[in-house]
Design a protein with these regions (language model features):
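Non-heme di-metal
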Residues: 1-91
């Protein structure tokens, strides 16, 4: 079973986040722009497939990193919503 590759530390709490267009605009590119979280998910998944026949261990590690990036994508999307922005995917 493939497991996420991540440090076992809690993510910051978002319960005190309030609407802020300025902060949302600052963070939006990290969500789904060319160098954002979505692209990281796609790149690690792509490399996972390419390494699958070469090294199962490397392939599984790459997918574990992709899973962690998916979690970041989810967290950032939730944060953007709390900041009052639509988490638009613009790859």
């Amino acid at each position: 079973m493939i497991k996420p590759v991540a440090v076992d530390l809690p993510y910051p709490d978002m319960c005190d986040v309030t609407v802020s267009r300025k902060n949302a605009l600052c963070l939006s590119p990290a969500y789904a722009a060319p160098h954002g979280e979505l692209n990281a998910v796609l790149q690690y998944t792509y490399h996972h497939f390419n390494f699958d026949l070469v090294s199962k261990e490397v392939s599984d590690t790459l997918m574990g990193i992709a899973i962690t990036e998916m979690r970041h994508f989810d967290i950032l999307g939730t944060l953007l919503l709390k900041l009052g922005a639509d988490p638009v995917i613009t790859t």
